[in-house]
């Protein structure tokens, strides 16, 4: 780059007529900013200077006010590129002589006698009776109309929604019922999905508690990371498949899933037993056979109109039948208690003590409060994992 030179020019900058006062193009003859070459370093001694007299003229061109190229610029040879502004006429174009090309005004509605001639047939008795129906009348006469063939202008105020439905004939389906039918299950699905995501976190929470028992006072660390497997430092509850502790983690999760399933089955069994849907015959001491057949001494037969038998019959060897009614609630629990009392005789000795302890209600409540105060913080980490199951248990308890 530089000023004037006697060497032949190459590439960009060979057109000396293109103004370049700032030296943006390489090897241009006008380069006062970036320095001239060694042959003629002075701007004043350049014999081929382009004084560019048009640069002093004030105008709006391609390069802004006061900077108008005299013979075209980067934007071309247009008048706007050279700074010459063309005035724009402010006179609007003449109106179109074709008046039929635009939007036509709405034509006046024809009289009722022309548009609906059947409405003028007043000699028909059946048609006259049909017009007494507001829905049929609304089809032929708008609001405020008469049967004389002329239509009265509609009032300026909006009519009630009932008049609209009366003029349209059959009522439109209530959209509120449709939307409620579609949107009603959405909160249920959202709550179910939330509970499902919370339930899926139960195995991980219980797994963390299980592994924490092996690291009392410290953070749980997987013991398989020091083996030959290239595993980084991680928790035993999130072992990768290449870690030797991955199999033990899966085994713990499987046992936890079985425990949760057993807990749900126990709750369902307790619920069915409370509702009286488990017709378990009580354990009758000294009986040889027990069946649910019809009994002579039982007021309600065992196989009657009820879904479940309401009494159990014992048939000793002498042929006489004895009926014992099934408890309407907690039949299975009473059966288990009787069975345990027969197998473990010392349980019957606890009955008076339990009855006496329950009778002392202040003592029971104080003992429960003391146990919750002492063991509550340590048990909360375990019980809190089962909180998502409580809404499911509550729904089953209410609707079954």
Swiss-Prot record:
Q: What is this protein called?
A: Large envelope protein
Per the annotation, which location comes first and is thus the protein's main one?
virion
Whether Ribonucleoprotein counts among this entry's keywords is no
Annotated region (Pre-S1), positions in chain: 2-119
One Gene Ontology CC term in the entry: membrane
Concerning PTM, the database record says:
Isoform M is N-terminally acetylated by host at a ratio of 90%, and N-glycosylated by host at the pre-S2 region.
Organism this protein belongs to: Hepatitis B virus genotype A2 subtype adw2 (isolate Germany/991/1990) (HBV-A)
- Ranges for the region named Pre-S are 2-174
Per the entry, what this protein does is:
The large envelope protein exists in two topological conformations, one which is termed 'external' or Le-HBsAg and the other 'internal' or Li-HBsAg. In its external conformation the protein attaches the virus to cell receptors and thereby initiating infection. This interaction determines the species specificity and liver tropism. This attachment induces virion internalization predominantly through caveolin-mediated endocytosis. The large envelope protein also assures fusion between virion membrane and endosomal membrane. The middle envelope protein plays an important role in the budding of the virion. It is involved in the induction of budding in a nucleocapsid independent way. In this process the majority of envelope proteins bud to form subviral lipoprotein particles of 22 nm of diameter that do not contain a nucleocapsid.
> Which residues bear sugar attachments?
320
Family per similarity comment: Belongs to the orthohepadnavirus major surface antigen family.
Residues crossing the lipid bilayer are 182-202, 254-274, 349-369, 376-398
What are the recorded Gene Ontology BP terms? caveolin-mediated endocytosis of virus by host cell; fusion of virus membrane with host endosome membrane; virion attachment to host cell
Residues in the Virion surface compartment per record:
2-181, 275-348, 399-400
